[in-house]
């Protein structure tokens, strides 16, 4: 967590704080008419030219053909088939494309794309007889496939067979990203999240063209990655988490599994080992890393700024070199993140010494450095990337680094932090950087946000999710969605397309997709959520839930087309927004 002072984050307190609170979340409400598919794509494409009256029917005989002889293109085709088969029930065989695109096919080709799409963009042309996605790389094909998914009804994301028909509107789309780097961060140190949860998050990122996953692997509360040369980091340092749970860690095989799974979704994993602060789990594991030679106790609170590696000891840099070497060997991507934030227990002089010693250790692994923008207090090489997490719109260190050739990742805490609450009644999350509603998450320009950091100096945008209060996949969903989609659009779409009114319409059209995927998203009152023809709220026989009403154990209400039973006394806690920690039991659709 990036915060100037310590904060408590017990789950029980988060739940109790709901008592007497009101909610600003909205119900799923039917749009006046279903949003046309070409007006519901997130991120919005750079250019869309509709073909009036034309649709491509996806039917049982439809096939997927891919660039002949290209394994990466075939992998994208296999991925697309895997998305569409469960809901449609169609076979959708994948094979090499012949010389000309056959009728009744979806073609994924690595030839014929306009030069303007670059290495990550694509061209998509849908006609009455075929859909053709062209790109220069498999990354571009994969991006085009994500757009293709959103041209189909949201129920296509269901894991079970759904009724058709399935049609794709006729159009020509030419699309490419504003920034090459579009990322999200998951903190697996404060609360450990198993491989299955990380993979689920990867799938959620991929559909919005996010191409980098930053994993926060070590902090005061736990060390989460196996390091053979320092085994107690995980066997001891990985045994705790916030609140005193059992913690956990990834073996090298599990981490490799995550990296490979992300790569199959065209996402690069960026591992972070935060230092010289946020290191209590390491200090507790090895006494020799402490200046006084005494290992502190493991900690499960959420205080920050109290721990530091011993800057003057040679063994500190042996330790760091070993960790970086083993981590780099597991990580095919170009970056390693060294943290560098909130090092309050490290003197200013020692901090500069530390950064200057660690930079060449990273370079020795063949990787480039990313660090929280605090590292820009040192003189950085042009290859280093400071990640801005502050709440201001200027930073002298960052602007100096840019003047020397560095590019910046933007994650301003009051705009991009997914762990910030939406409002005062949000049941989980923090608020030190302020509340971030959907419009706040969308309403800033990364290319003109930081003084001295113009568009060309921005590597991209990243959405960090710190996990002091985040325990379950449902918690991840609730804080990430819908804000992650807003950040994805900021990173992908040209600024000329930026329009809140249009975006909130397209965002509302995502609801049927998220419902089909089982994503527990926050139903912001700022957005008119389209139910896509599913059961509407208010059709249940039981009384509709009210934020102002007091409920006690056994009370039954209806909300969002489901029937809910209260477990205990409550007022203001919206059914379906707090997962396993909530007061309401979901009895299913009415």
What do the predicted segments below correspond to?
Residues 530-590:
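Tryptophan-rich substrate-binding surfaces of secreted polymer-degrading and adhesive proteins
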Residues 89, 381, 390-537:
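Flexible, acidic glycine-rich loops studded with aromatic residues
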Residues 64, 137, 184, 205, ...:
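Conserved, mostly hydrophobic/aromatic
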Residues 34-179, 475, 491-502, 508-517, ...:
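Contiguous, structured surface segment used for ligand recognition
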Residues 282, 286-406:
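Active-site neighborhood of glycoside hydrolase catalytic domains
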Residues 1-34:
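Secretory targeting and sorting signals
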Residues 117-306, 315-317, 325-328, 332-335:
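Feature activates predominantly on carbohydrate-active enzymes
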Residues 182-186, 213-215, 269-273, 336-338, ...:
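Hydrophobic faces of well-ordered beta-strands that scaffold small-molecule active sites
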């Amino acid at each position: 967590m990036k915060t100037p002072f310590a904060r408590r984050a017990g789950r029980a307190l988060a739940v109790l704080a709901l008592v007497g609170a009101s909610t600003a979340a909205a119900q799923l409400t039917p749009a006046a008419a279903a949003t046309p598919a070409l007006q519901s794509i997130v991120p919005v494409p750079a250019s869309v030219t509709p073909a009036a009256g034309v649709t491509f029917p996806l039917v049982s005989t439809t096939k997927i053909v891919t660039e002949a002889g290209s394994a990466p293109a075939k992998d994208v085709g296999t991925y697309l088939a895997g998305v569409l088969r469960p809901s449609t029930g169609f076979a959708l065989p994948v094979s090499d494309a012949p010389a000309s695109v056959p009728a009744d096919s979806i073609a994924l080709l690595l030839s014929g794309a306009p030069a303007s799409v670059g290495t990550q963009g694509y061209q998509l042309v849908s006609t009455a007889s075929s859909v053709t996605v062209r790109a220069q790389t498999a990354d571009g094909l994969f991006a085009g496939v994500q757009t293709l998914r959103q041209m189909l009804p949201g129920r296509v994301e269901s894991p079970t067979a759904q009724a058709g028909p399935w049609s794709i509107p006729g159009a020509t789309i030419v699309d490419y990203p504003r920034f090459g780097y579009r990322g999200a961060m998951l903190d697996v140190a404060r609360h450990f999240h198993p491989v299955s949860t990380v993979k689920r998050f990867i799938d959620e990122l991929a559909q919005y063209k996010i191409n980098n996953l930053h994993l926060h692997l070590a902090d005061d509360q736990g060390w989460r990655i196996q390091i053979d040369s320092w085994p107690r980091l995980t066997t001891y340092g990985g045994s705790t988490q916030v609140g005193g749970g059992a913690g956990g860690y990834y073996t090298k095989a599990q981490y490799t599994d995550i990296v490979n799974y992300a790569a199959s979704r065209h996402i690069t994993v960026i591992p972070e080992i935060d230092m010289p602060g946020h290191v209590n789990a390491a200090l507790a594991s090895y006494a020799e890393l402490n200046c006084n030679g005494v290992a502190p106790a493991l900690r499960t609170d959420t205080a920050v700024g109290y721990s530091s590696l011993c800057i003057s000891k040679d063994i500190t840099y042996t330790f760091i070199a070993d960790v970086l070497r083993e981590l780099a060997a597991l990580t095919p991507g170009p970056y390693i993140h060294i943290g560098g934030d909130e090092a309050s227990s490290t003197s200013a002089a020692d901090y500069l010494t530390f950064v200057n010693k660690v930079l060449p250790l990273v370079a020795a692994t063949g990787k480039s450095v990313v660090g929280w923008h605090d590292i820009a207090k040192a003189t950085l090489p042009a290859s280093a990337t400071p990640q801005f997490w502050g709440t201001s719109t200027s930073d002298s260190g960052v602007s100096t680094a840019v003047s020397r050739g560095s590019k910046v990742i933007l994650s301003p805490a009051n705009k991009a932090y997914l762990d910030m609450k939406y409002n005062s009644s949000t049941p989980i999350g923090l608020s030190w950087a302020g509340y971030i509603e959907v419009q706040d998450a969308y309403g800033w320009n990364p290319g003109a946000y930081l003084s001295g950091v113009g568009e060309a100096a921005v590597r991209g945008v990243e959405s960090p999710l710190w996990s002091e209060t985040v325990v379950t996949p449902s918690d991840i969903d609730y804080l990430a969605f819908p804000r992650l989609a807003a950040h994805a659009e900021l990173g992908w779409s040209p600024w000329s397309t930026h329009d809140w009114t249009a975006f909130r319409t397209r965002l509302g059209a995502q609801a049927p997709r998220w419902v089909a995927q089982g994503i527990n998203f926050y139903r912001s009152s700022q957005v008119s959520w389209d139910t896509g023809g599913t059961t509407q709220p208010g059709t249940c026989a039981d009384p509709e839930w009210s934020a102002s009403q007091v409920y006690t154990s056994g009370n039954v209400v209806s909300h969002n087309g489901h029937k809910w039973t209260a477990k205990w006394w409550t007022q203001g806690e919206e059914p379906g927004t707090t997962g396993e920690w909530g007061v309401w039991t979901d009895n299913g659709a009415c």
